[in-house]
């Protein structure tokens, strides 16, 4: 049975033992995709940040907290998968330093002109999908070559949707990218558009996340079938 990897939910980047940076991702789309993939006959492993939603019983779930932990788990699991869907919303930045004790007002830099403002130094976290994209096995017509892997990313954009999404697709070496908007965050419905590497819109899907997930899995299967037909070894 072919196995796919799904990243899901937010991540947390702690400032101290109490406070952390995060976002409003609920993990609902990841859970819906996991169920849809199981229904389609895939074996499913989910790498999930902290969420309240329940994943389907048939899926293996690997719980993580930080972006670094999510990347490590995904990189370990991806080699045994035929593809991966990046439905998670990992934090893009982490604090430069994590305090061992709850921070006080004097623990961050204040300038004389700050008027009570704190300066929080952040560093970029690793890009999980780009890391997977850099290691994925490409599809090949060579019958002796290992089977290829596919990669599908999500892109939440508020402007220049196509341009920004395609830039992400290319930078992360993905095969498809799913463009959604902020209204889907922490909601039960979603409005998405699937783009391929040429910028062509393969589908526009709206509705309950359960239904959207089923359509997404079907579109991915159709894409992979077409790619496989062009590469008989996979």
Where are these regions (language model features)?
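A cross-family phosphate/adenosyl-ligand binding-site feature
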Residues: 1-234
């Amino acid at each position: 049975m072919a196995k796919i990897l799904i990243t899901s939910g937010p991540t947390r980047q702690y400032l101290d033992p109490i406070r952390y940076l995060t976002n409003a991702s609920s993990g609902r789309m990841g859970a819906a995709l996991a169920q849809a993939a199981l229904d389609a006959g895939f074996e499913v492993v989910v790498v999930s940040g902290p969420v309240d939603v329940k994943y389907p019983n048939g899926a293996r779930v690997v719980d993580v907290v930080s972006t670094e932990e999510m990347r490590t788990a995904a990189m370990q699991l991806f080699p045994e998968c035929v593809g991966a869907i990046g439905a998670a919303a990992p934090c893009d930045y982490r604090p430069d330093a994590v305090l061992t004790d709850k921070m006080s007002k004097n623990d961050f830099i204040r300038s004389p002109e700050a008027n009570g403002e704190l300066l929080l130094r952040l560093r970029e976290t690793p890009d999980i999908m780009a890391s997977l994209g850099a290691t994925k096995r490409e599809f090949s017509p060579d019958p002796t070559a290992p089977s290829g892997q596919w990669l599908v990313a999500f892109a939440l954009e508020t402007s220049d949707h196509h341009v920004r999404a395609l830039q992400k697709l290319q930078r992360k070496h993905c095969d498809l990218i799913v463009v959604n908007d902020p209204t889907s965050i922490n909601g039960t419905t979603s409005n998405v558009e699937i783009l391929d590497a040429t910028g062509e819109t393969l589908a526009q899907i709206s509705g309950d996340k359960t239904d959207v997930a089923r359509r997404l899995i079907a579109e991915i299967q159709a894409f992979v079938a077409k790619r496989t037909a062009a590469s008989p070894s996979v």
